């Protein structure tokens, strides 16, 4: 334990030395470690602030406040801001810039110090921007526990980190920064629990996780990632997201699906059907595409790389987005990813040229409301393309009904599905029954899987192999009997 503690103390000194070295020039360029900082700051700062929950009249704790890029903006609306940084010259610079705000308290303190005294249940929002990457794994874990205590019930933690690799172009003699995988942060925050003196149990619920769009646009870089968490009762129902990530879309399940569908894909036909369907969209360079239920991002990378479009990929599954972000490393394409519930998102009118969704909307119970949102979000002349599981008209058999229930699906026949799009205001609606193609693709995937049985079992397990094979055979039975169908839908906004 003593050796471990000594190592942590030494690492803390390394980080302090690193930031003293990079705080000689107290400028935005020095703080962001980037020669383009001034231009980036103009678009990135408003974007980051837009991700926060409402903070008017709230108490905000800003950890790693630096020279105050965000302090003044927070002070404009918050009732109180505590701006904290562990480099004295930096926090003094912040005070010289923002000291005229009487609702800001400036503190020179280290977030890892046990002597840092913040009262329990006293803060509405904890905000940090590039902080945790300068802490050890153990320090991150301890800080998350303390932050949960400092927050009022219902309060929020927002943080943003550089993941995978550095983004700034400043030359550095050494770089002790921890460029972690996003799933490291997600796991630690998700697993943090506490009990207060009254016996109430609390945990953190993920509200959102996304790339910083300014970095995707300017640097084709998805490694700037933000999270928003809320302090909730441990008994609160976490709903559909937890169901997805703990059952159908566990990490291992996603990897199994990808093995069947091909690298980057977790939906029917993988790259082959993606090429066919995307070719129907007449995509033009610079157009903006929303992919609803983007999975692990293969279709988004394909569109961005081959058609030079900008893609926003959203998925409710934290695990899916974690994989998508990892797959984006080094691709240098204009794709943003976000953990989001499409039924709760609200984009401005006329935001997208295309909305694309593959075998996802089967999870959505109120499709008419979602299609009305799609219509609103599309630009005039914009297109929607959806492939989805459907059912034959009439009452399903007991077995198929049980399958639908177990998966939590909401299925319609192809004609009814097309009518829902028409009723939402779309024109030129094409509703095609593609079940024959679905059967061919299923059989092809099953044949390929059976041919590489030994390799699959080596990489996963025999149980995993049997699970996938049985699932594909069951789908083939349901589709050949005509109960389960597959629809392709294309429609246009006038």
UniProtKB/Swiss-Prot annotation:
Its EC number is 2.1.1.103. It is an enzyme of class 2 (transferase). GO terms for biological process: methylation; phosphatidylcholine biosynthetic process. N-methylethanolamine phosphate binds at residues 248-249, 257, 389, 403, 407-409, 475. It catalyses: phosphoethanolamine + S-adenosyl-L-methionine = N-methylethanolamine phosphate + S-adenosyl-L-homocysteine + H(+); N,N-dimethylethanolamine phosphate + S-adenosyl-L-methionine = phosphocholine + S-adenosyl-L-homocysteine + H(+); N-methylethanolamine phosphate + S-adenosyl-L-methionine = N,N-dimethylethanolamine phosphate + S-adenosyl-L-homocysteine + H(+). Phosphocholine binds at residues 162, 167-168, 172, 179, 257, 389, 403, 407, 409, 475. Inhibited by phosphocholine but not by choline, glycine betaine, monomethylethanolamine or dimethylethanolamine. Monomer. This is Phosphoethanolamine N-methyltransferase.
